[in-house]
Amino acid sequence: MVISHFVNRVRLLLPLLLVFAGLGCNGGKGASSAAASSAPQQDAQPSPSQPPHYGEPAEPAKHVDAERAMQYTREIVAIGPRWDGSPGQQRVGAYIHDKLKNDQVEEDAFVAETPAGKIPMRNIVAKFPGDKDGIIVLGSHIDTNYPLRKTRYVGANDGACTTALLLALADQLRGKKLPGYSVWLAFFDGEEAIKEWSDSDSLYGSRHLAAKWQQDGTIRKIKGLLLADMIGDADLDIIRDQRSTPWLEDLVYEAASRLGYKSYFFADTDEIIDDHAPFASQGVPVADLIDYTYGYNNAYHHTTEDTLNKLSVKSLRISGDVILEAIRLLDVNADRLAASPRASK
């Protein structure tokens, strides 16, 4: 079993163990039973054997301006490294505020206790009101890897492009009251570990915001949380995350299928711990939309090779349009699907 503690998500891969298991080897069983389900599965079946019937949204589909999303990505990358406690962290927060200056925006500021001491952090939440009682949350993290702070690591795919994508989605959401649920954009700070990934050294922003929303009752109003992470990769391959809510992942796959993009979704499965996890533990339906094959064997992730030339406008268009279609489907299907037998799996 390979568990990388230096990365910002725990990817549990067992290719060698599975080979030895096939040869009858019984070594290393201490951790294998807990992690075996996370090994990549080829030809995964993303939908249940009896796919649900989805109600049809009345409103026409919207489309993200992917060229604008790429321009926002360039501007965020130009800020430079954005690790927590850095000037770049402050600048990216100011950049987000500037892009959302005419919207309803709230800050969730806090001081995180980290292995490097106390570090000020802030989540930024933009709220777009809807006609229905309920909230759909779209999330992305805004920080870059802390251990790489002395390099020119800029996190083009890991942090920049999904922050940019949310800003481009905001351009589609603003203007008039939404016909369905309210949509909130959550820009999470402190996703990356400061020293080494652990329950206490990671996901600082999402853990803080989930706790706050649990305390004030917001959690109970959330119909679904769609997290975007590392999905600007030109070679797009979004995995099916086994820690996400099955019915919501099914709905995302339905959205992709309707748009002709299903070949980019869920060919493989894996278990990912990411900013959706604190909300899942509170009972929120979650889906982590993440491409964890960034370069051969994920070679570009958390390296200075995570640069703009690895991204594509097409991938941002696919990801953004599928998220918008998923919002449309959630507007008319969320309550019924959450009460279905699939929701208990």
Predicted segments, located by residue:
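C-terminal motif of bacterial Sec signal peptides marking the signal peptidase cleavage site
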Residues: A21-G24
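Bacterial signal peptide processing site
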Residues: N26-K29
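N-terminal capping segment at the start of a domain
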Residues: P46-G93, Y296-T307
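Second-shell loop/turn segments in exported
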Residues: E56-H63, V77-P87, F110-P115, R149-A160, ...
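Acidic/histidine-rich catalytic neighborhood of metal-dependent amide-processing enzymes
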Residues: Y153-A255, S263, D268-E271, D275-H276
